[in-house]
């Protein structure tokens, strides 16, 4: 019947969405290690947040100190706040040893060059794998274009598992 056909279509759509979300979560987990997640950044200015996140990337061998210095310098040239809630600092070069994302989240916004920011994602781009990661990055930024998405992430990402699963859901819906 038509109702049966519609139920099957809905199930197939739900299954495809679940698979896409799982693939996206796996890609995010590759780029965001548990130690790359910081809950809270109060009292820090943009440079302090970049250096805090950068130290975690350095400790994991994803970048060296010059990459973090480059991200700080890039931020001084022009704010990397993408929206009223997200900043995405990064260096001008793709000199990271591997592509990685370190994320800080705080329920209280910090002042990011005049923009209130709840989420900071320090992106480390490696030359290898850049094209593959570009899709993930585009969806990441798109997911944060909606204020409600940012607030949902801020509430839901209380630990690493919550961060990755919430990000994957938001990005899947955005992409």
Model-found features: residue ranges?
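Cytosolic covalent-transfer regions centered on His/Cys nucleophiles
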Residues: 1-175
């Amino acid at each position: 019947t038509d109702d049966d056909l519609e139920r099957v279509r809905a199930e197939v759509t739900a299954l495809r969405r679940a698979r896409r979300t799982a693939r996206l979560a796996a890609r995010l987990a590759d780029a965001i290690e548990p130690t790359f997640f910081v809950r809270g950044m109060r009292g820090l200015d943009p440079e302090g947040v970049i250096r805090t996140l950068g130290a975690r990337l350095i400790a994991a061998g994803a970048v060296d100190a010059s990459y973090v210095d480059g991200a700080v310098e890039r931020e001084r040239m022009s704010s990397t706040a993408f929206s009223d809630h997200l900043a995405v600092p990064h260096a001008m070069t793709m000199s990271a040893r591997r592509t990685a994302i370190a994320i800080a989240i705080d329920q209280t916004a910090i002042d990011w060059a005049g923009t209130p920011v709840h989420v900071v994602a320090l992106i480390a781009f490696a030359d290898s794998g850049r094209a593959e990661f570009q899709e993930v990055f585009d969806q990441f930024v798109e997911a944060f274009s909606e204020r409600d998405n940012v607030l949902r992430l801020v509430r839901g990402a209380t630990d690493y598992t919550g961060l990755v699963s919430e990000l994957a859901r938001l990005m899947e819906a955005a992409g």
